Amino acid sequence: MSLDGERTIALSRRLMADGGSVVILEDVTERKAAQERIAHLARYDELTGLPNRNHFRERINEMLEIVRMRGNQIALHLIDIDRFKSVNDTLGHPIGGKLLKEVSRRLGSIVRTGDMIARFGGDEFVILQSTPSRRQDSGRLARRLVKALAVPFDVDGHRIDIGASIG
């Protein structure tokens, strides 16, 4: 129960032997927020906000079922960021983290609505291309991804050249 739209209150009522009752109100706002946060972290990467490996696994299972039922096609692009370790080693993890956020934004600007980008961890990303109409479409997307990630990034005044390996 929410009294003011901001706090969550749990109400419990116990009947007493004499016919009366005891009502207990407990503010569970923080507990509910913590549970929601844990549920979110179980499915999304904290750094980039992208779906994580668990969420990806759920989605690909759904997509494979659709493929079986309808005969659709899907394509999977496994992306490994080249030279990411040297970015972390030379510029530090905070810059590396910002670079990963920029990589995820750049990937997001390329894929179509309905496709899924997930971060598997470290410098590994996966794109689930949900409806390539022809095999050439998946190859075309892979080339666009490689080309986009070859363009240098500017992170806090640092020009960062990376690349990507896609399989």
List each model region and its residues.
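Short loop/turn elements that form and flank the Walker-type P-loop nucleotide-binding site
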Residues: D18-G19, G71-N72, I162-G163
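Per-ARNT-Sim (PAS) sensory domains and their PAS-associated C-terminal
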Residues: M1-I9, G19, H158-I160
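Output-coupling edge of small sensory domains
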Residues: R13-M16, V151
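Conserved long alpha-helical elements within nucleotide-processing catalytic cores of c-di-GMP signaling
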Residues: A39-R43, G49-L76, D82-R112, A118-I127, ...
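PAS-family sensory domains
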Residues: D4, L11-R14, I24, S165-G167
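Sensory coupling linkers of modular signal transduction proteins
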Residues: M16-A42
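Catalytic core regions of nucleotide second-messenger enzymes
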Residues: A118-R119, R135-Q136, L149-S165
